[in-house]
């Protein structure tokens, strides 16, 4: 009896000849095209530096330029074609309305470019949530826009900025992130720019949304759990290209034994709207109510919000007769985000009913 191998020799030999060719074909298969991501640097802790590696809370923000920031994460080249632009070099507590407008117009110009697939904005965390929400309202693009920061400077032990930036670029270059509005990536989470806020100033898990994250980033891959339902970006009635200045809107903080001094001073200084950062359900102390009623008669919009830490939820005509007073409620927006929406919305309308509609929809 002939050996079994000998009987099948022609077939075996043919298979052996094909195997190297198949392996070679696999080796020369074209790699997946990398996305083109632009990083706009504005400063903040992510561009900060301390005197030593032990300085995680005492450091100078906005020191490291964008080219050095990108060089600190060489792995970026493996997930995207990245280039950087230095827009500002400031600590974010110093961000102004003019800075928002300039940044917004820069983002819009890039978003219109065919060779840009996604945009990352490095930003200080103090007002990161305000910038993210502003861009959510005014950028007409489905391309991913991701705002990212860090809680520790790059010089600190266990600095979080490198991974945050890596994750931001991964999300910005991911087609699955399109059409989800402006995003925030911090501490491995993908958060909505609309409702995420800085909840603590000394931990790396600083940013949270009362409604939870949209998803997670793990080793450069995005995993999604929910999608935004409020109007944003391409579905927004506001367009950065049509805005030359934001309306003057101020915030007055309420607390036990508060007086009406701040409200009067803000109105006298030219505020067209005052965000009442109230306790609980945006409550207004009895001694302040007459002043707010009078300011509304003078044309100042009064917008009730809540400064509770984990997320307020202000209902109309609860605590105060908003219909009677012709006041507006901020719904679930915290005071600083309510200021952003009012400042944008009042570039189009001064009507309180229209403004209330906008607060419900955005």
Curated annotation (Swiss-Prot):
Coiled coil: none annotated. It is found in: Periplasm. The active site is at residue 45. The keyword DNA-binding does not apply. It is an enzyme of class 3 (hydrolase). It comes from the Bacteria. Substrate binds at residues 92, 125-126. Its EC number is 3.5.1.38. Its main location: periplasm. One of its GO terms (biological process) is asparagine catabolic process. Keywords: Hydrolase, Periplasm, Signal. GO terms for cellular component: periplasmic space. NCBIfam families: asnASE_II (TIGR00520). Belongs to the asparaginase 1 family. Homotetramer. This is Glutaminase-asparaginase. It comes from Pseudomonas aeruginosa (strain ATCC 15692 / DSM 22644 / CIP 104116 / JCM 14847 / LMG 12228 / 1C / PRS 101 / PAO1).
């Amino acid at each position: 009896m002939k050996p079994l191998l000998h009987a099948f020799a022609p077939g075996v030999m043919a298979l052996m000849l094909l195997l190297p060719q198949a392996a070679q074909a696999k080796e020369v298969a074209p790699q997946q095209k990398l996305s083109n991501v632009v990083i706009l640097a504005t400063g903040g802790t992510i561009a900060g530096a301390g005197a030593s590696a032990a300085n995680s809370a005492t450091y100078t923000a906005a020191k490291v330029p964008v080219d050095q920031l990108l060089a600190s994460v060489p792995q970026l080249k493996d997930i995207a074609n990245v280039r950087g632009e230095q827009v500002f070099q400031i600590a974010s507590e110093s961000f102004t309305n003019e800075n928002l407008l300039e940044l917004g117009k820069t983002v819009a110009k890039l978003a219109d470019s065919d060779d840009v697939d996604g945009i990352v904005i490095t930003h200080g965390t103090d007002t990161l949530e305000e910038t993210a929400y502003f861009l959510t309202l005014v950028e007409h693009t489905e391309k991913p826009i991701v705002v990212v920061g860090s809680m520790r400077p790059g010089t600190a032990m266990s600095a979080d900025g490198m991974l945050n930036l890596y994750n931001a670029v991964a999300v910005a270059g991911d087609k699955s992130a399109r059409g989800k509005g402006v995003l925030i990536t911090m501490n491995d989470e993908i958060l909505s720019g609309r409702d995420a806020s800085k909840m603590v100033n000394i931990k790396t898990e600083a940013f949270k949304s009362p409604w939870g994250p949209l998803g997670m980033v793990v080793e450069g891959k995005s995993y999604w759990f929910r999608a935004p339902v409020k109007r944003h970006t391409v579905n927004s009635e506001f367009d950065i290209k049509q805005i030359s200045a934001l309306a003057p809107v101020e915030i007055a903080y309420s607390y036990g034994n508060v007086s009406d001094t701040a409200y009067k001073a803000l109105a006298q200084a030219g505020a067209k709207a005052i965000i009442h950062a109230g306790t609980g359900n945006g409550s207004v102390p009895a001694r302040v109510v007459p002043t707010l009623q009078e300011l509304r008669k003078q044309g100042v919009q009064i917008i009730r919000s809540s400064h509770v830490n984990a997320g307020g939820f202000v209902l109309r005509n609860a605590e105060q007769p908003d219909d009677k007073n012709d006041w507006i409620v901020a719904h679930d927006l915290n005071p600083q985000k309510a200021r952003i929406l009012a400042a944008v919305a009042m570039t189009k309308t001064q009507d309180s009913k229209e403004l209330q509609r906008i607060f419900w929809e955005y």
